[in-house]
From Swiss-Prot:
This is Ribosomal RNA small subunit methyltransferase H. The keyword Protein biosynthesis does not apply. Keywords: Cytoplasm, Methyltransferase, rRNA processing, S-adenosyl-L-methionine, Transferase. S-adenosyl-L-methionine binds at G37, G38, H39, D57, F83, D104, Q111. Belongs to the methyltransferase superfamily. RsmH family. It comes from Neisseria meningitidis serogroup C (strain 053442). PANTHER family: 12S RRNA N4-METHYLCYTIDINE METHYLTRANSFERASE, S-ADENOSYL-METHYLTRANSFERASE MRAW.
Amino acid sequence: MSGAESYRHITVLLNEAVDALAVREDGVYVDGTFGRGGHSRLILSRLGDAGRLIVFDKDPQAIAVAEELARSDKRVGVVHGGFASFQTALDGLGIGKVDGALFDLGISSPQIDDGSRGFSFRFDAPLDMRMDTMRGMSAAEWIAVASEQDLHEVIKNYGEERFSRQIARAIVAQRAESPIDTTRKLAQIVAQNVRTRERGQDPATRTFQAIRIFINRELEEVGAVLPQVMCRLKEGGRLAVIAFHSLEDRIVKQFVKKYSQHAPLPRWAAVREADLPEPPLKIAGRALKPGEAEIAANPRARSAVLRVAERTAGPIPEQSQRKTSEWQ
């Protein structure tokens, strides 16, 4: 077992998320965030021999686990890449419509707890933060070249950090003297420039979150995949998304709301709302959060929110049927 595999990972809202998919034995399902396979294995336990599960992940360590699972279970297909390539990947696998798709957003416990990955300020490690360590620019590389304004905007917009301007200014000043290439160096700069601290939260939390989200294009990928899933779901198919912070959850909530209701008609409209075709989605139950027992067993579950939508027979608006290349 590799170092990364030794880290304990507890799947959040495991039963609730898979129950929300209403898995059919012969269905085709997508786990857009395989991680260590908690949701995937439960989906597989409910699929019959004719069922199929396609799993996505950027993380090479997660992909190694997924490929091992695929070798022992021919119902599993593996995609090494971000879920924003949803339609392209399904096309490549010869898959048309699907019965359900699940996304467990954000960072996984093994990624946080593996100090070498550079996601956590709890370890002194190279400042990487990439979910796919074989592609793209690391956090240290970006910090070395980003303008003060770009640093400020990323930390403010993705971390909702009040002291973003002071932190950005300090980063630029420090990097002129020596590279900011470890998690400890960045955490120390942030701590020196956050004047008030939130109870129970390290001052570096928001800045690390912001840079991680930016480096991995997390919010862009969420916004890109949702319309693709809507286009690929069969009638009655389910979309289930677990979000861990307000920025992700807002994107999901607004998307589902937009496509589960009609836009208000002007007073002079010649048609009534009752005469319009039904919206392409409907909200399937209320948003769910972990119960007290789950939070006690896994404190990282505290902020999780599960939202579920179901595909109807309603037509999808033309602007949501863009070419896949426009989403990537």
